[in-house]
Regions:
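Short gly/ser-rich loop at a beta-strand->alpha-helix junction or flexible surface loop bordering the NTP-binding
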Residues: 1-208
Length: 208
């Protein structure tokens, strides 16, 4: 009778990750895989993960002070690939431990970081090389190409390589960058016969 008298309760669109109780209502495994993505162990509606800014803001409440989103977590923020189940962060100066995150310590320049919707995150190029380094040569090729489709370029990748930990033991990664994104001599320079050729770089970027 109360329902008839007052009508249904006001409904509001969900704009946050769903809690366990909410995700158990009207469950359908097939729809779950289409409508939700598991991030840090929680089901999140896909429409909240469409952009870099949305993904960065989703992780920001879990980000410890004075740290940056790093590694696979940063890769997901930039590309939307491989949602993290545990947050990986980087600390420049502080040395501390957090049970809820995987923390690494790096001394990196400001050029290797980006602010995404106000959330500090390692840059796309550095995230790509960290992923490629752990994935190996075969998968590393696809990772670099994916990074380029999301805005990375040869110059940025080579700069990031200079700050990559273990680069001296992983020269194959630099070779892979040069193989996939070779420097191209400008045709205008070739036409002038100039000995000091201007170098352009291949850029597969697209607007995000």
């Amino acid at each position: 009778m109360e329902y008839i008298a007052y009508g249904p309760p006001d409904l509001e669109a969900n704009v946050t990750a769903l809690n366990t109780t909410e995700t158990q209502v009207l469950r359908c495994n097939t729809l779950d895989s289409v409508c939700f993505t598991s991030v840090l162990g929680k089901r999140v509606p896909n429409y909240l993960l469409s952009t870099c800014s949305q993904r960065a803001l989703l992780l920001s409440p879990k980000l410890p002070k004075y740290t940056y989103i790093f590694g696979a977590s940063a890769w997901w923020v930039h590309t939307g690939e491989n949602p993290p189940q545990r947050l990986q962060v980087c600390a420049n100066l502080v040395r501390s431990s957090w049970r809820s995150v995987d923390m690494v310590r790096r001394q990196l320049p400001a050029s290797q970081y980006a602010q995404i919707a106000g959330v500090p995150c390692i840059c796309l190029e550095h995230a790509a090389l960290e992923m490629a380094l752990h994935a190996g040569r075969v998968q590393g090729r696809e990772i670099i190409l994916t990074a380029c489709r999301h805005g990375a370029n040869r110059s940025g990748l080579l700069t990031a390589f200079n700050y990559l930990r273990g680069r001296s033991r992983n020269g194959w990664l630099e070779q892979l960058i040069n193989e996939l994104l070779p420097a191209v001599i400008s045709t205008r320079t070739l036409g002038t016969g100039s000995a000091a050729g201007r170098i352009d770089t291949v850029n597969l970027a697209h607007d995000r």
